[in-house]
């Protein structure tokens, strides 16, 4: 069986969700052993960091359509599928089909049914903390410190990945640490 970008993403998410691994450590290790193309590696990175970042929102979406708690592996797979459908802009047929392909024979029908429902229904969020996948206390703190519109805008902005820059020596850093590059020439890339 050939390795797919989603199978690598699922392997990383399983390590993160079930073994307590850190995404920034497990993902590079898995990618270094894979034979994926650069675009596929970027897609894996988006899936892993995005699914991890939006975990609470993905769980709220899944919980809307399941009657009993799925096993841990199935929950992780459903999160991956829900992230693709709701947040990553992946075409529904592609997200559902590719995610179901990763399911076990026993769970494939269940995963297919849940993700098809997710793909056709507009989510009604209980609150901004769930929609933006933050703990309640963070959302409450922001809403207590600024206007509701400013709080939501700040929380939304913090969910946007920082642009990445590469120095000519190959060092990669996010834009928030650009002050480090003040003494070393950097190119946006």
Predicted region positions:
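Class I Rossmann-like S-adenosyl-L-methionine
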Residues: 1-169
């Amino acid at each position: 069986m050939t390795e797919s970008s989603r199978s690598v993403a699922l392997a990383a998410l399983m390590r993160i969700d079930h073994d307590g691994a850190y995404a920034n450590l497990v993902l590079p290790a898995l990618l270094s052993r894979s034979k994926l193309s650069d675009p596929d590696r970027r897609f894996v990175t988006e899936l892993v960091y995005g699914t991890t970042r939006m975990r609470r929102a993905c769980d709220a979406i899944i919980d809307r359509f399941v009657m009993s708690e799925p096993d841990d592996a199935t929950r992780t797979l459903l999160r991956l599928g829900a992230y693709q459908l709701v947040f990553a802009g992946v075409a529904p047929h592609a997200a559902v089909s590719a995610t179901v392909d990763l399911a076990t024979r026993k769970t494939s029908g269940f995963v297919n049914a849940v993700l098809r429902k997710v793909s056709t229904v507009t989510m009604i969020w209980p609150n901004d903390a769930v929609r933006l996948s933050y703990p309640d206390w963070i959302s409450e703190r922001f809403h207590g410190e600024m206007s509701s519109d400013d709080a939501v805008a700040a929380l939304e902005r913090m969910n946007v990945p920082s642009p990445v820059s590469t120095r000519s020596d190959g060092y990669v850093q996010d834009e928030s640490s650009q002050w480090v590059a003040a003494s070393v020439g950097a190119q946006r890339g």
